[in-house]
Amino acid sequence: MKSTVATVKNPTGKVQADICKPFSGKVFYLDLTSKLISEKLEKDIKELGGTVEGFLSKEISYLITSKKEAKCVKTLKYVCSVPSPEPAQNTGESSTSPGNRRLPQEGNSSKKNEKSLVSRGKSLVKKAIKEQEILPKNSILSNALNWGVKILHVEEAKRYIEKKKSSLQQVKKSQPVVKSESKHPARRKVKPQKLKSPYIKVEDCSCQYRPLYLVLPQFRSFQNTTSNYLVEVDKKADVGQKLAETKQSINKTGHVQDGANNANIKLKEQKKHGYCECCLKKYDSLESHILSPQHKNYSESAYYQVVDDLISTFEFDFVDWSKYKNGRKSVGILMLTEKYKAEGQERNEASKANTFSERVSATTPLQENTLKDPYATSCSVPPTPVCNTDPMFSLPSPVGSAELCNKKYTTDNFEQLVATSVPALCLKDNLPGSLGEREMSVVYNETKQNETIDHTMERPKIGWDASNIPSNILLYVPQKVDAVAQYANVSLKGNIHCSKLTACQAALTYGKMDPAVCDNITFPKTVNHLHNKEGHRTMDQIYPTVQSDELQSLLPDYSPSGNLHRKLKTSAQTNLADDELLCRLSHKVSVPQQNDVLNVPSETLLAMFESSEDKTEFFGFAGSCVCDPCSMDDGDNRDQAHKNLLLSLFSHTTTSGSSFLGF
């Protein structure tokens, strides 16, 4: 320690370089319990150029500890350095002799002899006891003593470091100070702060001068009150619009901006930029882009023709018709109406032809009746008189029946009607144009309190297209009329006849018919004498027939001929004004034909139909040509003709696979 201090006070040429760092090249180990003291000492040692190690080794120069044993390190070194007594030196003098006893005896000589008389073993024991009491084995201090490390107490180390610092300061003061000249003057350190609006700031672009700023409590307005535009703006504006503009012009600070600045802001807000995916182009204004030729060409092209066709089928419910006053409409709507104008005319013509053809097939001199069916009212047409001036009853057009009638039926030329007649119905399923087991008929039932009248009729078979006939056709029968009167009006005497059937009626009722034969067909006019006092009357007095040879020429091979005799139950007390009608479509199930029916005589068949008291209704036979009535004056010939027709009904049927579909 003294040598080091001496070197600092009397420095040589080599040590002058290490004046600022006297602890350079020296290693320290700190054995301290206090963490604060160790951190402070470590900081001072590093400032003086020393290093601090965390592990004790032989390379450490100084050991700084806080233990009390470090204060008596010098005595420990002295004890360890005292040599042990050698017993060989006293070997010659061990034996007592009378010469030694004769030495002069003094007071001090006796004490010295006691110390010298201590044996070697006792001295080693004493030494070991002292070492164990002061320094335990394998401790930091014992290892440092054995390795030759210098041990310092904390207090001594602090005083030593303070002396080094003071000597260092004296050396720095004695040396001349060299001032470093800087190019730029030192700036004054100012803490950064955030400027609060409103403020003014002037800043140098080269950053050589500090910026100048001024924070104001209220910003002064520099805008002029006059407008920037050359053209004067109309001062007549709504009060609400002015209030909205003043609210928008108020800044966060509370001051009001001029209206000219607000106009610029509004123009910027109105410009809406976007991108058109159709044209693949950006636009600044949507309205100007829509009116551009590029966008118009794309919109008028056929890219979305399929979508336009689908939209055109929808109803225009979303159009605001209040905008189109006095019948004015947009161009697009007018184009749609022109586009589908031709289709609408065709549909109207088809529906007119359909209703006319069905009306002709069902017209008879009947009284007018009002339809109560909601579906029938939309399809009904005004009645047309045939054979007399009585009002007619119109048959409603079934669903989808517009395609069944040809436009040529609307003409009055009989030759065209016969040439374009529709295929008639037949009985066999394998023939084209037939309905098979399906048969259209009309049932007429009227119910009273005590008595019942059942009128069954055989409806004329109208020529239909079998592929287009709907399954839910509703047939209507008027009131106050007997069932047979739908096709013919007969007087009991037979001397009053109406005019001949019209061409349309004949063609629709009897299928393909020769015009020459139609001249021979006549019908009676009225049915007022149908109900007699007896209450029962057969149908043979009502149905006129055609000659047998003419009938055979008109009938095809597959359809039956002749008329069916049925019994009508009537009552004299029946009020025809209160009758109600029930109309429906009846589907008949085919019945296999029996072989024994062919052998039944005509009288038995006639008796079977006349004696039947069952209330079930017979709907007739489905054929193309049935019931060709004509006027006959002789009653006997009329009965004979009916018998022949009954036989002809079964004469055209065969037993090989054909089925009887009548009942």
UniProtKB/Swiss-Prot annotation:
SUPFAM superfamilies: BRCT domain. GO terms for cellular component: nucleus. Keywords: Cell cycle, Metal-binding, Nucleus, Phosphoprotein, Repeat, Zinc, Zinc-finger. Forms a complex with cdc7. Zn(2+) binds at C276, C279, H289, H295. It holds the Pfam family zf-DBF. Residues 87-99 have a biased composition (Polar residues). One of its GO terms (molecular function) is zinc ion binding. InterPro entries: BRCT_dom, BRCT_dom_sf, Replication_Regulatory_Kinase, Znf_DBF, Znf_DBF_sf. Regulatory subunit for cdc7 which activates its kinase activity thereby playing a central role in DNA replication and cell proliferation. Not required during the initiation of DNA replication in egg and during early embryonic development but is required later throughout development. The complex cdc7-dbf4a phosphorylates mcm2 subunit. Gene3D superfamilies: 2.10.50.40, DBF zinc finger (6.10.250.3410). Residues 18-111, 136-161 form the BRCT domain. Phosphorylated. This is Protein DBF4 homolog A. The keyword Repeat applies. Disulfide bonds: none annotated. A zinc finger (DBF4-type) spans 269-317. The keyword Ribonucleoprotein does not apply. Its main location: nucleus. It comes from Xenopus tropicalis (Western clawed frog). It is found in: Nucleus. Residues 84-119, 171-193 are annotated as: Disordered.
